[in-house]
Amino acid sequence: MKVTTRFAPSPTGYLHIGGVRTALFNYIFAKKHNGTFLVRIEDTDKERSKDQYIDAIMDGLNWIGLNPDNEPIKQSERFNVYKEEAFRLVDAGKAYEDEGAIRLKINKDGSTLVKDLVYGDIEFPNKELDDLVILRSDESPTYHFCNVIDDNYQNVSHIIRGEDHLPNTPKQIQIVNALGYKGFEYIHLPLVLGEDRKRLSKRHAATDLMSYKEEGYLPEAVLNMLAKLGWSNTTEDIFTVEELIKIFEVQDIQKAGAVFDICLLYTSDAADDWSS
């Protein structure tokens, strides 16, 4: 299997430190398997998506050294594709129109199995899934629908993202099956938490990646800090990206939430290691 991963941020704000951790894990997993790392801009939120945020996201990835192997595609430029796929499902009797929107029909019998390489097999009862809106009445696609279509279009093999997306996965598997796609491998990462074990926010520390650049931190230091958020297989403190690629294994990803510790940006021998 050719490994292809993707980092798919929404340009509704600056690049969050938790998102950079997701990008890093996608990058090193792809490179470990001689695969491809993609970036996709999920800008279907017309009101909140801004070009300035797209520029900031790409600048941040460039600064930290996680450059994609593609020219990022924008979902806002693919609305016709999503519309065509939605009506293909309607024509096949797998979706229906509802007050101007289009919903996917969900068989309420049985369950949907999510096979996750970190959290294991998880079954979600289908009776708990609503008939999903896949196209809104204004013909804009919903997140789940265009997400699946683009992952298939870009030949993504492994979806690596935060574990807050686990409840989304059975919905997306239903879409995958309805569209007749091959499907994907899933790797969900533990959430990045503050010291109070609540989801990391600005009250814990700076969450915007470029804030760390402005404060004078080295990108290598930030990468090392992020690598330790939810993954560990060694007592070593300092890694180059090449070393991370070599030693990274999915089975070393932890399930428990990863506590953000600003002190991980400081090590006694960091300057010597990175300047050598």
PLM region spans:
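Single conserved hydrophobic/aromatic residue that forms the stacking wall/gate
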Residues: 266-276
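Beta-strand segments within the central parallel beta-sheet cores of soluble alpha/beta enzyme folds
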Residues: 39-40, 72, 185-189, 238
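Generic recognition of stable, solvent-exposed alpha-helical segments in well-folded globular domains
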Residues: 52, 81-84, 167-171, 187, ...
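N-terminal Rossmann-like or analogous alpha/beta NTP/dinucleotide-binding catalytic cores
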Residues: 1-101, 126-127, 168-179, 221
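Short linear Ser/Thr-Pro motifs
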Residues: 10, 49, 201, 275-276
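Short acidic (Asp/Glu) and glycine-rich catalytic loops that position anionic groups and cofactors
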Residues: 37, 65-66, 152-155, 200-206, ...
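A conserved active-site cap/scaffold subdomain adjacent to cofactor or substrate pockets
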Residues: 211-264, 268
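Active-site cores that bind ATP or allylic diphosphates and position pyrophosphate for catalysis
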Residues: 75, 88-202, 208, 212, ...
